[in-house]
């Protein structure tokens, strides 16, 4: 019901049915992610952290490995000389005898089948010099190198000799033992060019022998070079390890260090009847070796290509 106003006039009627409603108040959206959204991203985040950690560790490991490898190659190219160890040191002799000397046979492999043995030309000559001596003693340095026959195999298998076979090259050493030289000993080593033991780098490409005084300039950086460490013992130390002081035949092939090896021998303490030395150097080097052996009471008797035969004067008949 409409009530009259003071002037008897009714006020205008207002209706709200067609007026628009005010918009509802809006809620402020939170800018931070919710816990549920974090749970959805957690596996991916964990993977990224783990991947980054693994890659960091891998890079550090690779850098350390490369550094260690380089240092190893540097050490492999460096000769170790045991200056304080005399060639007649009792501990050295015991070490050679108990650790390095072994029978010249390979029990786990079938012996190599070869024709002969037949004496080489220089061996046949030496047999005549020694009047077909039986049961002699030899030392052969460089036996079976590069597939060559041993100059002492005929002496051992046909004339009952025995002795020591020296071979520094690993492959040739194992082939040596397959020749079934049961009367002799073998050693995987080289003859030292100094009157004390040393450890050197053996370059597999040096097929003529161990280049003791030469280190290849590309040894550290050149991956085509395969190097191994080889121990070198003085000739006199090896004789003491075998309990001998007298040798009928010494065959010396050491790839360029023959003179230095001969200079380490105390000729006043050992007796070597015949020395067959390989000389592949120039004429001046040959003359130097000849003069040295002549000074040690040897006389030059005959040459066979690069092999030169010397004999101790007082042993000649």
Show the residue positions of the predicted features.
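Phosphate/nucleotide-binding beta-alpha loop and adjacent structural elements of enzyme active sites
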Residues: 2-317
